[in-house]
Amino acid sequence: VDHEWFKESRESRDNPKADWYVWADARPDGTPPNNWMSLFGGVAWRWEPRRGQYYLHNFLSSQPDLNFHNPEVQAATLDNVKFWLDKGVDGLRLDAINFCFHDLQLRDNPPKPEAMRVGRGFSPDNPYAFQYHHYNNTQPENLVFLQDLRALMDKYPGATTLGEISSEDSL
């Protein structure tokens, strides 16, 4: 929430960075737009009064999710990668890279039966374990972006990436 991009994005719905983060209107009763849970506990949405909308945070509320459906966000991300590669870094660790894209319809994740609530990297009593995460991560668009990232990395011989992911079908 301290990044300049987010500060600009939250100020209005029509500024140049308005669509750089995942924003959504409240449901008619004022609650978050869907049932998505944060991996670190609680709902994955936080109300932003300046903008009058919720923003998505799959992790901490201080880590709002970039809107990778926006081509400008993808380009800016690749520009940042290029900056560091030009500086001579040997590679990048891609933390939770499968969380870049979300379902554009913001559909509710289906509930998971109690017997299936197994934590992979989180406690099984964390509400995050109570859902199948079909819509808040691991979307098909993610692979297209990773292909673009790989194409950039291939221009730097010897540079490597290490991606960290987890998903329902990861094992």
Explain the meaning of each model-derived region.
Residues 92-94:
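Hydrophobic residues within beta-strands of alpha/beta enzymes
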